[in-house]
């Protein structure tokens, strides 16, 4: 789900917008907390860059980052989910994939297949912004008042693959599961 969230958000952005500051809302952190989701660690009121937000969606699988990116690019969660499902149709996978939220929270109306996830990942890797995020081994956010040293995110999966098989064998990835 979060790869599609990244893709839909990134398609509404450009490289110049990556440095733009976004304030983390209480709604974003509450959504993450109430749904017992993984979080990037952004705090209410924290001013982060769009690039920080996008990396926060993927590397630590941050629900608050996904929520905030959805609101930032589409205005409401409902509109963002509509945008996600329009992208599903564009990719030709609407028979077996449908999204009901930008985070991947379990819902019978939020479903996909492994094959469709590969289609989504392929589309994301064709987007320059997405490719940069999905292929990052490590990323440190910009310094903020709440995190003076920034927050360092690491792709445990890509780093493990690099250690075992050598760098460059896998160029982009996102792990995830639903209980």
Name the predicted role of every residue range:
Residues 1-115, 124-128:
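Active-site-adjacent loops and short helices of periplasmic peptidoglycan-processing enzymes
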Residues 94-95, 106-179:
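Domain-terminus/edge residues, biased toward the C-terminal soluble/receptor-binding domains
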